[in-house]
């Protein structure tokens, strides 16, 4: 091996115009230097290489490794000057016999395909490239999100738009118009701000959460009621990097249906309260048991009449009772009569007010089967 390595190292540090050349032919390495600004011609470089390796009588091909690790040929003045100018800081030259040379080995990515050449070109630090993970991306940047779903009404929607610092516009236009509000005095028309147009391919259209004719209610927590169109526009521009818009969608069918804790319970409680105070027999008569229906009928009748008529209900012949509703009716009437005397004194006033509406014809409130108590029951007897 040539011992001029230390000399070339000195040239590299003290002479910035010198380019160190490391040539390889087979298992031999040679080192020499060239002038970066005046490298000369390719013929002179060719003669220098073959003279340095003592192969003057052999036809060879010369190639070099560029900064990207690709093996490129040196066969004219242009690519020779390019090779010298791109050397940083070392120009690696490879020499092969022409009959043994593979001309298809030159080109981009050739050194990465030839393992033996790669080992000779690079040291350990450059040879071990990190493996490129070409797969589905793991870190997605959010474009939009729906927030405050729990605290907003179902007819409203709060959308957050993310721009991530790039110059892509928000992608929608707004206009002023007239909206209808429910006030204590009725429906009133008030000024409102609406989305007039969506820019195709814009940020707002790509989210799918905003649409034309959606009414803008708030911008970053500030209500737009009472503000002009220019003021709302300035508010959106000032908060465009993190815009939070509360809208009332024009198409309410796309809203998320949530289970309301107040609406569902209030409906059920109202229904149950009304059923107890309006018509006690209405809910019971929908069932298939006639005994409960007759018991409820006794409550209505006995609450409106005098107590001395109650024993007549018990004096009905057992045959007629069994023919109407069975033998269990007598026991049900007896239990209901005992509970009526205790509860009638407490709610006597409310029962009388309710029964006043049923006095004209109690048959209409009692849906009884044909051939039942209608003939022998207490409703006809009393």
Swiss-Prot record:
InterPro entries: PAR6_homolog, PB1-like, PB1_dom, PB1_Par6, PDZ, PDZ_sf
Entry superkingdom: Eukaryota
The PDZ domain, residue ranges: 158-251
GO biological process, any: cell division
Ranges of compositional bias, category Low complexity: 254-278
Chain segments carrying region Disordered: 254-295, 311-330
Keyword flag Oxidoreductase: no
Coiled coil as UniProt keyword: no
Swiss-Prot/TrEMBL domain comment: The pseudo-CRIB domain together with the PDZ domain is required for the interaction with Rho small GTPases.
Similarity comment text for this entry: Belongs to the PAR6 family.
Protein name: Partitioning defective 6 homolog gamma
Organism whose genome encodes this protein: Mus musculus (Mouse)
Gene: Pard6g
């Amino acid at each position: 091996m040539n011992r001029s390595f230390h000399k070339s190292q000195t040239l590299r540090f003290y002479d910035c115009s010198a380019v160190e050349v490391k040539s390889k032919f087979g298992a031999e390495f040679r080192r020499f230097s060239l002038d970066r600004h005046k490298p000369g011609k390719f013929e002179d470089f060719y003669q220098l290489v073959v003279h340095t390796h003592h192969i003057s009588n052999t036809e060879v091909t010369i190639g070099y490794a560029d900064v990207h690790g690709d093996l490129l040929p040196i066969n004219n003045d242009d690519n020779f000057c390019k090779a010298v100018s791109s050397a940083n800081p070392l120009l690696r030259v490879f020499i092969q016999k022409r009959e043994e040379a593979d001309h298809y080995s030159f080109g981009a990515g050739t050194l990465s395909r030839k393992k033996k050449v790669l080992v000779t070109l690079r040291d350990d630090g450059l040879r071990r490239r990190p493996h490129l993970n070409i797969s589905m991306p793991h870190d997605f940047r959010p474009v939009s999100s729906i927030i405050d779903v729990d605290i907003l009404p179902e007819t409203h929607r709060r959308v957050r738009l993310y721009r991530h610092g790039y110059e892509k516009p928000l992608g929608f236009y707004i206009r002023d118009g007239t909206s209808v509000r429910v006030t204590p005095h009725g429906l009133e028309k008030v000024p409102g701000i609406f989305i007039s147009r969506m820019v195709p391919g814009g940020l707002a259209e790509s989210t799918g959460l905003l649409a034309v004719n959606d009414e803008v209610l708030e911008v970053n927590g500030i209500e737009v009621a009472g503000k002009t169109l220019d003021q709302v526009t300035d508010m959106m521009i000032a908060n465009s990097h993190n815009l939070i818009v509360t809208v009332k969608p024009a198409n309410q069918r796309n809203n998320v249906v949530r289970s309301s804790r107040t609406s569902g319970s209030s409906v059920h409680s109202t229904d149950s309260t009304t059923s107890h105070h309006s018509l006690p027999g209405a809910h019971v008569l929908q069932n298939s048991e006639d005994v409960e229906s007759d018991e409820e009928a006794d409550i209505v009748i006995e609450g409106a009449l005098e107590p001395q008529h109650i024993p007549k209900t018990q004096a009905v012949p057992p045959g007629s009772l069994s023919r109407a509703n069975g033998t269990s009716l007598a026991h049900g009437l007896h239990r209901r009569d005992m509970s009526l005397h205790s509860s009638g004194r407490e709610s006597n006033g409310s029962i009388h007010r309710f029964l006043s509406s049923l006095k004209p014809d109690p048959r209409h409130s009692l849906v009884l089967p044909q051939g039942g108590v209608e003939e022998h029951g207490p409703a006809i007897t009393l």
